[in-house]
Amino acid sequence: MRHIRKHLAALLCAAAVALALLPAQVWAQSWENGFLTVSETQGNPLYPAQVTADDSNGTSLLAAGGMSSFDTAAQAADYIARQFKARENMAFFYTGYPADGPFLALTSGEESAAYSDEEQALVNGGTSRAAILQRRQLLKYVRHLVTEELLPEVFRYIPDDPTGGDYMRTQYRDVTYAADYDGYTFGVSVTFTYFTTAAQEAEADEAAEELLDFLQIDSKTDYAKLQAIYGWLCGHVAYDYAHQKDDTYLIKNSAYGALVDKAAVGQGYAALLYRLALASGVETRIVTGTGRGEAHHWNLVKLGSKWYYADASWDVGRQSWSYFLQPSLLYHVPDDASLAVIRTCPLSDAVFSTAPGRLNRDDSIDILDVQLLYTYLATGAVPQGDGVLPEGDFRLAADVNADGTVDVYDLQTLYETACGLR
């Protein structure tokens, strides 16, 4: 094993990986001493235009030594997720490949494709066509392994993980994956170009905790939590027009930029709202797509049994919010990946009512609402009937004084409101 790793080190130290605009792909391949080596860089599919050819900070770590070994995709994905959160690169041995080797069969088009410049150089140096095709098969397998098996699991949505799921999925610019295979050992490295460093994420962790304490989030209802977080974003984070068109300034896309630097573009606003809301116990997703025809990010948030849209970056500086807890957003077009998520989230068909106490759908606070709340307090069960809000929405609206508890004080307040005494 030590002998193999020394050969891996020699190979990978010699491989230079550059970036290229999608769909162009970067190949750094060599065939020496019986080793097959491939690598490729792909931009984050959310914003491929940000991938450039001359500013990658990623290099393969296959030469690092001391790598872990995994025999299932789930184990490898868990390792990648932990390394991602630490803003580290990663390399590992993988034994979960098919019995006949880490290769995928080529289509006729892939097999007959013209040689790339790098392949032609290898052919000119004496590399056989069979070896070139084997490289293509290995590259196809590692591409499939990383992008279709590992990363979807790495970015899987977990409601109680504020810095996982959608947060990680939107916080890197590109990924380079490389593989080495000698007929016995299959090594993989995955290198992300992150928007932030580990130190910046640690600073954001501390700042997020301090902000939530300042907002007294723990004492609020879910609606009041979102209202406080959204209000802080709209009032304290400036839209980063200075770097809006600068694709090399990655901080603008991050929660760190919004929280610590107090400046971000839409992606940074959405990432921070996601992070703060999940840390507060409110389910949230990040929606990706276009806003007025340009790449944009916004949020879905869950209140009661329904989901609502929110876009803090479009409400910055407004006295009244037009993009908070809406059933739809004008000029916002989700991409296919987000549409798949949205289909699993039952959307509200109306703007969230910011007037607690409306326990049915008649848009007024009257004696019927008082009767519904009295029944709920007496029986402990949400009343059933035409027009009565679903259970989750009912409990939210029933907390009339927004103290986090539904009790006789809410009933008294609701009665006085219905009678015109408030």
Where are these regions (language model features)?
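Sec-dependent N-terminal signal peptides of Gram-positive bacterial secreted proteins and lipoproteins
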Residues: H3-W27
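Cellulosome-associated attachment modules in secreted, modular CAZymes
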Residues: L19, P23-A28, T354-R422
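Intrinsically disordered, low-complexity N-terminal segments that are enriched in acidic
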Residues: A28-G187
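His-Asp-centered catalytic microenvironments across diverse enzyme cores
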Residues: W31-L36, K306-A355
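Extracytoplasmic/secreted proteins, especially bacterial periplasmic and envelope-associated proteins
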Residues: Q75, Y79, Q137, E203-E210, ...
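Secondary-structure boundary elements
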Residues: T196-A258
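Sec-exported extracytoplasmic/periplasmic mature domains
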Residues: D213-I217, G231-Y239, Y274, L278, ...
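Hydrophobic/aromatic-rich core segments of domains that either
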Residues: G268-H332
